[in-house]
Amino acid sequence: MKKHAIIPIFIPHRGCPNDCVFCNQRKITARTTAPTADEVKNTIDTWLTTLGEVPTVEIAFYGGSFTGLELEEQSSYLAIAKEYKDRGLIDKIHLSTRPDYIDKDILDNLKAYSVDTIELGVQSFDDEVLRKSNRGHTSAAVYEAVSLIKEYGFEFGIQLMIGLPGDSLETCIYSAKETVKLKPSLTRLYPTIVIDDTELLEMYERGEYQPLSREEAITRTAAMYKILDDAGITIMRVGLKSTDIIGEGGSINGGTYHPAFRQLVEGRIARDEIEPQLDRIVDEIRERRDKSCELIANHLQGRDLVNESFNQQRLSRVKVDVFSSPKWFSNAVGNGGENKKYFEEKYPELSIKFRVDDSLEAAQFRINCNT
């Protein structure tokens, strides 16, 4: 049974005066109408009729800088959500905004309307990356916003982007580690894509920006994922959905988009965990076979007999079982079976079977060698 459902309400970026290089919302907003109160209610009612029995239901206001809207407009939307919460029809109210659009007046208003979670579009903790991305604030704004949010007792989340101008593996890891220090309830990881009507597209066309390859994006995101996951932080999303692209109002002109990007990342994490265990097994097998062939060579007469015995040893494949939790079984095999293919090519000595072990946790793997 589904444990958590989100009812998304998209609010255009009319509250955000900034021009981040990756965002085209200021241009889209000119031709996008904000939802009316009736439209918001209809959206919520429609979702509620389809959800069934779900322990936790959230109304989430997406679209960027919700707290950048005029306070009166924020309140009009929040009043609708609070009504559903007061009636017991939903459990939480969630919104996303910029770190520099948090102050005590805003938080007082959010508290009055029973908001639970504030998600901050941090994108990076590296000031040079923020500057090159024209974010309009430094990392100091993040620390200040989080301090205030904690003071008021809200849950908070952090969104990070991978592959912004000036970004690197080192700055990505730094951002993940700084996130851990702040102890958010949730995170989202988004590889940068280049969409229409953005400064980033112009930079790309001028040769001033190079999007990450898929391999680079997977490597960096996997490194960040492991840091956050090891700290026990919930990773709500990895990569954009196709509906996110539509919501952003543009087609992709560069960067990493894959409908199953999370599985690509989790599959890489699985491979990185399984591979050293298989390496050790293969090293032991090769060592045993070398010793076996040496013993055979000492007892057999003639080069042909020795070579024949050696080749038989080489052709004998060792059966190995790779166990994972049910939830991570597909990640062990890899998206499209890519991990399975990778291991088969790297370890011709092994006959590998992927199996489920209910006792294992997510991202835990056990190897059984049937020698």
Q: Model-found features: residue ranges?
A:
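Short acidic/His/Gly/Ser-rich catalytic and metal-binding motifs that mark active-site loops
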Residues: 16-20, 195-202, 246-248
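Conserved non-cysteine loop/helix-boundary elements of the Radical SAM core domain that shape
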Residues: 28-42, 63-218
